[in-house]
Amino acid sequence: PQYEDLMTATSNLTGKKVNRFTHLHQSTDDLIKKVKMQRLLGQKTAACFQRCVGMDAANAVYSTTFETDEACGTKYHENFVKFWTDVQNNDWGVDGAMTDVKGDRGLSPSKQADPDLFLHVVERTADGVYVTGAKAHQTGYLNSHYVLVMPTISMREGDEDYAISFACPTDADGITLILGRQSCDTRKTEEHNDIDVGNKVYGGHEVLVIFDRVFIPNDMIFLNGEVKFAGMIVERFAGYHRQSYGGCKVGVGDVLIGATALAGEMAGSSKASHVKDKLIE
């Protein structure tokens, strides 16, 4: 109850109270509460809480699908609203997936020596599409119910198969996950490690997600070949996600500053000018 105003919001889709991580921003106040929520959770967990990317992806795709439909006569916005209503009603965790492995940065997706360096459509049917490729550096994927996939860069004519956005279950047929390690992973298995603050059970898992002819039904597709709108998703996501970093990283920074100040007190050096200068900076 203490943090209910920060952690929940009223859905513009259903009128119900929802987890703010599933909320679609409607005002400046929503954006302020979002970043305050993220700073609070950074302070409380001192770790990545893994739902920010999905929230930022949803807000980018929500507005972009509306504009795509207006320009192209598609039904992507209707698809997304239906999907996201289910997300809100069930409080599903959603991983936002943007980063491709990319290959030669000087070439567009369709000009790469290996076509799978960017996730793309390999077959279209009356019922949907099959996609192949990979998304890298997926921090919250293992702990999410769904993945919301977006293009990673602006597209141009010839890149139509790469201008694709969709959602699917994180364990859909054809998906393989490669788990990355962190240098301090084994600390979680040591005895008497309760001194560590943070999410010791679920924090820090990062995967490379490989899609091998994964089928995406039509009603889960939010962009499919409309190249000029790929960049719009990227730009809007980037704006939302930069704001998120201004919350979560600052919250974790608060913990680091506090821990450093405590270490200074315990070492008897808290009044040293160079220690105070570093803490103030």
Where are the regions a protein language model picked out?
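FAD-binding core of flavoproteins
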Residues: T99-C248
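Conserved short loop/turn motifs at secondary-structure junctions
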Residues: E67-G73, V101-K102, V275-I280
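Intrinsically disordered or highly flexible coil/loop and linker segments, enriched in small
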Residues: N89-G96, D100, M220-I221, S269-S273
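Short, well-ordered alpha-helical packing segments
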Residues: V81-Q88, L119, A126-G128, K135, ...
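Internal helix-loop-helix
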Residues: Q2-V94, G140, Y146
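Conserved aromatic-histidine-acidic binding/catalytic patches
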Residues: T68-K75, N199, S244-C248, A267
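Extended amphipathic alpha-helical segments enriched in small hydrophobics
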Residues: S244-E281
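Generic secondary-structure signature for well-ordered alpha-helical cores
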Residues: N89-W92, I216, L262-E265
